[in-house]
């Protein structure tokens, strides 16, 4: 198959740029995270609802396709390898009831109990799904990312200090992701 030749770019104007940015650009502060805790880490609807407000930072997910280098007579042929999914991190504002942090701590303890090193061995019992909703300026969902089979591997420390005033505690949670799918604008995958 012949490679397509591209013409040199034409002179662009700000009006051309404006016509392409029809939605005004996606905003990184317009999002909502929905967490679900598995049955081994029971949490009530209050915790799930609070998480929609108190998860203050997250990321749209990354994935990677590793190259496989195949040597041939002094040259390297690059072949697409396996796809992997990065760890997903959320930052949570800690409320005085410690509800969200407590739910994550219970989840991790159910996976590996600190008292006797026992825990749930069936992955379907300790994994759950999570969602990130990217919103527009009207609060409508532009795109949804569904993270499949997540589980926490790190609940960060919370720094305590006498000289920390005018601030609220925060902590991060690192979750392992089996895979993710995106739904909505820009290359839809069929919604679940």
Where do the PLM segments sit?
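Glycine-rich, low-complexity intrinsically disordered segments
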Residues: 1-192
């Amino acid at each position: 198959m012949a490679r397509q030749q591209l013409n040199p770019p034409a002179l662009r104007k700000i009006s051309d740029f404006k016509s392409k940015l029809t939605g005004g650009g996606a905003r990184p502060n317009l999002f909502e995270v929905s967490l679900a805790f598995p049955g081994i880490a029971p949490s009530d609807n209050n915790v799930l609802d609070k998480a929609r407000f108190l998860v203050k930072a997250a990321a749209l997910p990354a994935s990677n396709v590793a190259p496989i280098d195949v040597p041939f007579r002094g040259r390297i042929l690059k072949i697409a390898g396996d796809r992997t999914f990065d760890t997903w991190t959320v930052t949570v504002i800690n409320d005085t009831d410690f509800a969200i942090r407590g739910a994550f701590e219970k989840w991790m303890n159910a996976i590996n109990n600190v008292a006797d090193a026992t825990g749930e061995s069936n992955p379907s019992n300790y994994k759950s799904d999570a969602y990130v909703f990217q919103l527009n300026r009207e609060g409508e969902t532009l795109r949804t990312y569904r993270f499949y089979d997540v589980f926490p591997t790190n609940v960060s420390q919370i720094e305590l200090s006498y000289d920390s005033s005018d601030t609220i505690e925060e902590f991060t949670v690192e979750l392992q992701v089996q895979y993710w799918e995106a739904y909505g604008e820009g290359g839809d995958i069929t919604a679940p």
